[in-house]
A protein has these predicted regions:
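Conserved N-terminal phosphate-binding loop of PLP-dependent enzymes in the Aspartate aminotransferase
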Residues: 1-165
Length: 165
């Protein structure tokens, strides 16, 4: 591995002891350092952090359409990392019955449509609680976000039908 730091952090260390005292098996790997350095350059050159904030706001706005689904209990997140919580009852936030394995059904149906989701069950005290995460690429376009939401809407309709909603 390598440590990637801003110029401010580097200058602070350089003005002090000049030593960054840390060690791991792969510390100081020149390839890892070069990759980290290039990644930071690309983030800066492409203004990708600001872009992620802007596109994250757009994603959040488009995700709001999913609140019309009877099983969508909450939508939350920051930037391009967004999560959707699925519930049996929107008012009480009672989780879906774990025996439904909703998160597995959601994952499989999404894959059939070419949509990659991170889904999980047992999010509430390790027993119940189904959720999914979206984390599109930093370079995602508005049209792609719209396509993702359209596919996700179709997937949810299909899975809701399978479980009787």
């Amino acid at each position: 591995g390598a440590a990637a730091v801003t110029a401010k952090v580097f200058d602070t260390i350089a003005k002090g002891s000049g030593v960054f005292a840390a060690g791991h098996t792969w510390s100081g790997n020149p390839v890892g350092a070069a990759v980290a350095n290039k990644t930071m350059d690309l983030l800066d050159e492409g203004n990708l952090v600001q872009r992620c904030a802007e596109m994250g706001d757009y994603l959040a706005q488009k995700l709001e359409a999913l609140r019309s689904h009877p099983i969508v209990g909450d939508i939350r997140g920051e930037g391009l990392m967004r999560g959707v919580e699925f519930v049996k009852n929107k008012e009480t936030k009672e989780p879906l019955d774990p025996a439904l394995r909703f998160w597995v059904l959601l994952h499989r149906e999404a894959q059939k449509k070419g949509l990659v989701l991170e889904t999980s069950g047992g999010c509430e005290r390790g027993q119940a609680g189904d959720m999914m995460m979206l984390g599109p690429a930093f370079i995602v376009r508005k049209k792609e976000i719209e396509d993702i939401i359209g596919l996700l809407d179709d997937v949810l309709l299909g899975v809701e039908k399978k479980i009787g909603y």
